[in-house]
Amino acid sequence: MSRGSRRTAVAAIALLAMGAAACGGGSSTKSSSSSSGSNSALVFGSSADPKTLDAAYVNDGESFRPIRQIFEGLVTTKQGGTDVVPALAESWQPSADGITWTFNLRKGVKFQDDTAFNAAAVCFNFDRWYNFKGIQQSSSISYYWNTVFGGFAKNDDPKLGVSLYKSCQAKDDNTAVFALTSPSSTFLSGLTLPAFSIASPDALKKYNADEIGGSASSPSFSSQFGTAHPIGTGPFKFSSWNRNDKLVLERNDAYWGDKAKLARVIFKPIADGNGRRQALQSGEIQGYDLVAPGDIGQLKSAGYQILERPAFNVGYIGFNQAKAPMDNQNFRQAIAYALNRDALVKAKYPEGAEVATQFQPPTLFGSSTSVPTYNYDPAKAKTLLANSGVTNPTVEFWYPTGVSRPYMPDPAANFQAFKADLEAVGIKVTPKSAPWSPDYLSAVESGNAQMYLLGWTGDFGDPDNFIGTFFRQKLPEWGFDNTKIRDDLEKARVETDLGKRTTEYKAINDEIMTFLPGVPYVHTKPALAFAKNVKGFVPSPVQEELFSLVTLG
């Protein structure tokens, strides 16, 4: 997820039966609209409205959630996992040198405006993104294009690099051939992102998709395509959108694959987490995402379903080495040994959370079993602190307010626990807090924070999306420039042999944790709560969750 919203893991969702009272938790009551028949409807309470329904312009979960129902990409991820599987492309083949990729497309697929999906449509979409101009190129708007492809046909920002994307050719209606500027091991997995969903070229042109106002920091998404006519190939199509009230999708009866079981899905914004829980309990909604750890037991006892996503995140303490004494290796190690991460995870996180030993989840290839683990050892922390030569050790420790994340449901509680650990070994802590966005993120990302709580939820199943995101370039929040780590990460990124990449990433994880730019402390399994009658929802580590599979019993 993006620098601003990459840590904004998909926010809470809920489902509400339209036009009548919805089910309670363990009860079997249901409204006429919450049956499993062809007229069933699901109202899904979200934490916020989408920014826009043009997938190319967004990087937040609340926008991507309905986008995933309307649009599809060439490839997607396996339900419940991160393996790449076919979507609009049935198969693909890279050339021996990794420069050319040929995608064989599904036949007989149509967009929701009844125009044909074909190779020309695929190339139109990629060429549209490649030719973005002005504020369209900013990372706040085209974050995922910048992440996967790194540049445009003509870069308006000199900081942008050469694009990985070179061209797309429609060899025939069912064959799209991509040319890259260099081999890339992350190209295919990057295409699973909803940002690369294929839209109807006719609709993009007719409804002025490239119409965008405002500034890079405060864009205005006013095009009719993104607000009223988003046209894709997915199992649901756009029906209506009343901002701050509800977004309604209806079943696409002309869908090329298995038809959706539900007639409609309705996304209803409920900003407050307690409000979403109360709405579930009152029967106003039927489920929501990112259940607070303290609510799980209560909801289970009341008969609600609790579903967990596989762990695909990391919570960590970051050190800014540009602010002494964080540049002192012994001092950083002293902090690591002082932190009782096991106690925090057991006390403050739901069942299934585990202590992190590195900056990527253990389920991802390249995780190492030989990293330094810095197990809780206050005596060793005191020795390292003495060896550091730092007199009167003091740190400014930042934590965010007004936010809850899967890896950090209660930032203040984490801060207090870690503060006590540090002071117990003789490190004085100066608390620094700020609202999450924009103040806290700005302070961290600009390099103003000395030590801070942060985290990351992965976008796709590749180590480069974790440790590459953090350390493949020099970033102010870390305040160091370790060229060995950067070079090793770049080498692993372009390596196309999976066995070699796995070995390389294991070594890099060892290297990172020896260098110790921060202390990863938790991987969590975000929980969703649903009423008993909601069936078929498959939690995904990357939030690739399809409502077309859901039924109401």
Where do the protein language model's features map onto the residues?
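Surface-exposed binding/hinge segments that line
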Residues: 138-212
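Detector for C-terminal structural segments
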Residues: 242, 338-366, 410-419, 439-553
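Ligand-site clamp/hinge motif
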Residues: 224-227, 241-243, 248, 252-298, ...
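Aromatic- and charge-enriched surface segment that lines or borders ligand/interaction sites
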Residues: 90-141, 177, 325
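Append "and occasionally in soluble cytosolic enzymes with long acidic Gly/Pro-rich linkers
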Residues: 239, 251, 327-420, 424, ...
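Gly/Pro-rich hinge or "lid" segments in bacterial periplasmic/extracellular proteins
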Residues: 79, 183-186, 192-258, 264
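N-terminal lobe/hinge region of extracytoplasmic solute-binding protein
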Residues: 45-96, 127, 231-232
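C-terminal motif of bacterial Sec signal peptides marking the signal peptidase cleavage site
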Residues: 19-22
